A protein has these predicted regions:
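Feature for intrinsically disordered/low-complexity regulatory segments and propeptides
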Residues: 1-88, 92
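Intrinsic disorder/low-complexity polar-acidic segments
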Residues: 87, 94-226, 230, 235
Length: 235
């Protein structure tokens, strides 16, 4: 399947692969979950050999909607359900979250959701509208990852690019106390949002600074002062 997209939704602008459900207005998390085809749960079941012997220490992650095995993981693996990803984003960004895209990749093994941050930022005179990206795997191949990115994720390639180039990101393995780790992520990403806002203000303040003609000439002289005879003959 093109771009490894199993199901997705997008707002207005159709992705290059043409797949998914198009909507005109950003949906709520409840509607986005359904539109993206993510309204299913992962359940863990025992793993058996061909001779019907129990494989200890391992579980199969199974999608409840069609009984598809998404992956085999250790019994220490903690599931993060799709609806928990949306709940996390709702809690972090607050009321009126605008979801841009969300979907399932590689037959449900990987999922993502993309939401607008609540503020636009003006940096060096340019208006920037970054997204909050939440990605998760159900096959045991990767961590839960959350990042701030300007990239509109619509497929495997754009997901990988967004995660690789994100300046602010957070990740969590599917082990230990998952709820505590996700609470920690909220605090980390809240600070990142504040950082972006302050950075935008600082650049805007610098942009407004004007220099007198004399100050400009002083800088030019400083940059282009001829080297002294000692400097020109040294080697």
């Amino acid at each position: 399947m093109a771009a490894n997209v199993e199901s997705m939704f997008f707002v207005r602008e159709t992705p290059w692969h043409g797949l998914g459900t198009k909507v005109q207005e950003a949906p709520t998390s409840k509607d986005a979950l359904i539109l993206a085809g993510l309204d299913w749960h992962v359940v863990q079941e025992p793993v058996y050999t061909g001779q019907n012997e129990l494989v200890r220490g391992y579980k199969a992650n199974v999608r409840d909607s069609d009984r598809k095995v998404l992956g085999v993981v250790t019994d220490r693996y903690k599931i993060v359900q799709n609806e928990e990803a949306f709940s996390f984003t709702d809690a972090l960004l607050g009321e009126g979250v605008r979801y841009e895209t969300a979907g399932s990749l590689q037959g449900g093994k990987s999922v993502w959701l993309l939401a607008h941050l609540p503020h636009e930022y003006i940096i060096s005179g340019e208006r920037i509208s970054p997204y909050l990206l939440f990605s998760n795997t159900h096959d045991g191949s990767g961590a839960v990852k959350v990042a701030i990115t300007p990239i509109r994720v619509v497929c495997c390639n754009t997901l990988n690019l967004a995660l690789q180039t994100a300046k602010r990101s957070w990740s969590m393995n599917h082990t230990g106390n998952v709820k505590d780790k996700m609470e920690e992520a909220k605090n980390t990403l809240f600070l990142a949002d504040r950082y972006m806002e302050e950075l935008g203000k600082e650049f805007e303040n610098l942009r407004k600074i004007t220099l007198s003609d004399k100050k400009v000439m002083d800088y030019i002289c400083l940059l282009y002062t001829s080297p002294s005879p000692r400097d020109s003959t040294s080697s």
